[in-house]
Amino acid sequence: ANNRPIIFSFNGGPGSSSYWLHMGIMGPKRIVVNDPYYTPAAPYLLEDNPYSILDWADVVMMDPIGTGLSEMIGESKGEDFWGVDQDIRATSLFIMQFLKKYGRLQSPKYLLGESYGTFRNAGVMNYLLDRGYALNGVIMVSAVFDLRTLTFPPNDDLPYIVHFPTYAATAHYHKRLNQEMQEKSVEDFLNEVREFTENKYMPALFKGTSITDEEKWEIAENLEELTGVNKDYWWSANLKIKAGEFFNELMREEGKTVGRLDSRFLGINEKTINQFAITDPQS
C-alpha cells in the first residue's frame, strides 16, 4: 500500500462538502445524469464509474469542518475553522495525521481541489511543505486564482480577456458561428481564438479611450465572427461583455439562456429583455 499513490480530494465553496467530486467523478459509483439535458426527478440512479482512478490510487474524500459529515467536537468553535488560514491549517493537520496513522508517509501524495478548493490547495501545499511533507503533485479542478476574474470589477480588463475563449467555445458548441468557423475542429478554432485574444483583443482593450472608432469596429466585427454575438452589441458594451451577459445574449432570439457552470446546458429565458438570465440551467 505504501507504493500506491494517495489523493486527498475536496470541493470548494467555501462551504461545500466533497459530495460532488465523490459522486460525480472520483468514487467507484456515480450518479446517472442526463448531460447536457435536465436530469429527471427521483428516483435517482447509480452506475459504475468508468472514470474512477481507484484502480491506480487511493482516494480520501474530505469534508471540511462544518460541511457534509464533518462536525466540530469538544470545545471547538466555528471560528477555529471558518477562515482562509484556519481552513488551511485544519485541512493540513488532518492530512498529516492521516498519513501517520495509516502508515502512508512513503506513498506518493497528491491534492485535488475544485473551485475554492484550488485556493485551499495552494495554502495546504505550502503549509505541508513547511513542515516537511512534500507532495508529488497538485491537481486543480475548475481553478480560480484571482477572484477578479469572477467579479468583473470596473476598469479591469483581465476578466474579459480570460473569459473570451470560453465564450467562443460555447458559441462553437451551440453552432452560433458562420459556416467557415463551424467547420473547424474545436482545437483549431480555439487556437485561432487564443491567438486573436492575445494579439488583437487584449491590445485593443488596453488602448482604453485611445482606441479609434475604426479600430473598435474592426474588433467588434472579429468578436461577432468568433462568438456569434452581434457586433452592435459588442460595440455598445465597449467590447467588454460579462459572463452573465454573454450567456443571456448568445441565444436570446430563441428565448434560451446558457448554463453558467456548464455552458453546454440550455434553459428557458423567461424574460429576454433582461441583461442577465433569471435561471442558471444545469443538471
Where are these regions (language model features)?
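Residue in the alpha/beta-hydrolase core beta-strand immediately N-terminal to the catalytic nucleophile
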Residues: 63, 110, 137-139
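Helix-loop module immediately N-terminal to the HCX5R catalytic loop
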Residues: 84-101
